[in-house]
C-alpha cells in the first residue's frame, strides 16, 4: 500500500469516526429520533438502508428492537457484530447444568482471547463443548473480528 492509499484510508476512518461522534452527541442530546430525522436500519437480508423518522409503527418497531441508527457506522458495526455472533453460534451448544460450559474470554492486560469454564448461565455467553471447539471457532471466525465485534475491543 502506498502512502496515498494509506492517507485515503486514514481520512475515511476519520470521517466515519466524526459521523459516529456527531450521531452519538445527537443521541445523547435527544435520546430519540424526532419527526423528519434521517436514520439507518438493517433490513431482512442484512443491508443497511436509510429512512426518515415519522414515528409510525415501522419506525417505532425498529427503534424498540435497537434497529434505528443515527450513524451509518453504527448500523455497519451491528451487521458485523451479528455475523460474528452467528458464526460463533455455529460451533456452540446450549448451556448445560452441572457440565463444563466453555466460554470465550478477553484478557485486557494481554490483549488475548482465552477460554474459561462456567457453571452458571450468563446472558450473552456462547457455550462450547470443549476448549478445542472454542479454539476452532476462534480460528474460523478470526481472533481480531471476535475481539472487535463480540467483545467490543478496538485495536
Across the structure, where does each feature detected by a protein language model lie?
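Structural boundary micro-motifs
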Residues: 1-155
Amino acid at each position: 500500500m502506498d502512502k496515498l492509499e494509506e492517507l485515503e484510508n486514514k481520512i475515511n476512518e476519520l470521517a466515519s469516526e466524526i459521523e459516529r461522534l456527531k450521531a452519538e452527541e445527537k443521541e445523547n442530546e435527544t435520546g430519540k429520533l424526532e419527526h423528519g430525522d434521517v436514520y439507518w436500519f438493517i433490513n431482512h437480508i442484512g443491508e443497511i438502508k436509510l429512512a426518515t423518522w415519522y414515528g409510525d409503527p415501522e419506525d417505532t418497531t425498529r427503534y424498540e428492537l435497537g434497529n434505528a441508527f443515527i450513524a451509518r457506522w453504527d448500523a455497519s458495526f451491528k451487521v458485523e457484530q451479528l455475523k460474528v455472533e452467528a458464526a460463533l453460534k455455529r460451533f456452540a451448544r446450549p448451556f448445560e447444568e452441572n457440565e463444563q460450559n466453555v466460554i470465550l474470554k478477553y484478557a485486557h492486560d494481554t490483549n488475548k482471547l482465552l477460554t474459561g469454564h462456567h457453571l452458571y448461565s450468563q446472558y450473552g455467553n456462547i457455550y462450547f463443548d470443549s476448549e478445542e471447539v472454542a479454539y476452532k471457532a476462534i480460528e474460523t471466525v478470526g481472533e481480531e473480528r471476535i475481539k472487535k465485534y463480540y467483545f467490543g475491543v478496538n485495536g
